[in-house]
Amino acid sequence: MFVLVEMVDTVRIPPWQFERKLNDSIAEELNKKLANKVVYNVGLCICLFDITKLEDAYVFPGDGASHTKVHFRYVVFHPFLDEILIGKIKGCSPEGVHVSLGFFDDILIPPESLQQPAKFDEAEQVWVWEYETEEGAHDLYMDTGEEIRFRVVDESFVDTSPTGPSSAEAASSSEELPKKEAPYTLVGSISEPGLGLLSWWTSN
């Protein structure tokens, strides 16, 4: 679920931090820049693990700050495909079941990846597994807040870097706001034995 990623970046340290240890100042600046941010095709950055190399620092004309090229390792949330995770149901919609890990919310289990047969209860706004028994179908509700075990089957990165508006977008900008896309999304599945709500598989 978590991986160590080697990165390189140039860190700017302002003059008023020169009295501090260089490593402490660099660690603080790196965490300010990266913590809780999604790096495209890398994952969600959590925290600095260690600094492996510091190159020479430079002070440029007109800027009293030091600029240091830093090699470091960062803890990143990036689950492997087919990895099993446990989260909590954040909510349900016709699109599927939305799951949260607490620190990461952009997880969707689409209808075709639920235990089958499944239906969406419009009145309750929940997905229901119509579990077949000898006595007939038994409805198992996927309620908000329930713990759920799922398999990661796909991931999607979206480049959300700021770009200038096109002429078509500029014309329609006053009419409607564009839908904000998540920079990193996971797609899950519970369509196999042992997956789904933990309460479904708890032995008495």
From Swiss-Prot:
It holds the Pfam family SHS2_Rpb7-N. The gene is Polr3h. SUPFAM superfamilies: N-terminal, heterodimerisation domain of RBP7 (RpoE) (SSF88798), Nucleic acid-binding proteins (SSF50249). It is found in: Nucleus. GO terms for biological process: defense response to virus; DNA-templated transcription initiation; innate immune response; nucleobase-containing compound metabolic process; transcription by RNA polymerase III. Its main location: nucleus. DNA-dependent RNA polymerase catalyzes the transcription of DNA into RNA using the four ribonucleoside triphosphates as substrates. Specific peripheric component of RNA polymerase III (Pol III) which synthesizes small non-coding RNAs including 5S rRNA, snRNAs, tRNAs and miRNAs from at least 500 distinct genomic loci. With CRCP/RPC9 forms a mobile stalk that protrudes from Pol III core and functions primarily in transcription initiation. Pol III plays a key role in sensing and limiting infection by intracellular bacteria and DNA viruses. It comes from the Eukaryota. Component of the RNA polymerase III complex consisting of 17 subunits: a ten-subunit horseshoe-shaped catalytic core composed of POLR3A/RPC1, POLR3B/RPC2, POLR1C/RPAC1, POLR1D/RPAC2, POLR3K/RPC10, POLR2E/RPABC1, POLR2F/RPABC2, POLR2H/RPABC3, POLR2K/RPABC4 and POLR2L/RPABC5; a mobile stalk composed of two subunits POLR3H/RPC8 and CRCP/RPC9, protruding from the core and functioning primarily in transcription initiation; and additional subunits homologous to general transcription factors of the RNA polymerase II machinery, POLR3C/RPC3-POLR3F/RPC6-POLR3G/RPC7 heterotrimer required for transcription initiation and POLR3D/RPC4-POLR3E/RPC5 heterodimer involved in both transcription initiation and termination. It comes from Mus musculus. Gene3D superfamilies: Nucleic acid-binding proteins, RNA polymerase Rpb7-like, N-terminal domain. One of its GO terms (cellular component) is centrosome. InterPro entries: NA-bd_OB-fold, RNA_pol_III_Rbc25, RNA_pol_Rpb7-like_N_sf, RNAP_E/RPC8, Rpb7-like, Rpb7-like_N. This is DNA-directed RNA polymerase III subunit RPC8. One of its GO terms (molecular function) is DNA binding. The keyword Transcription applies.
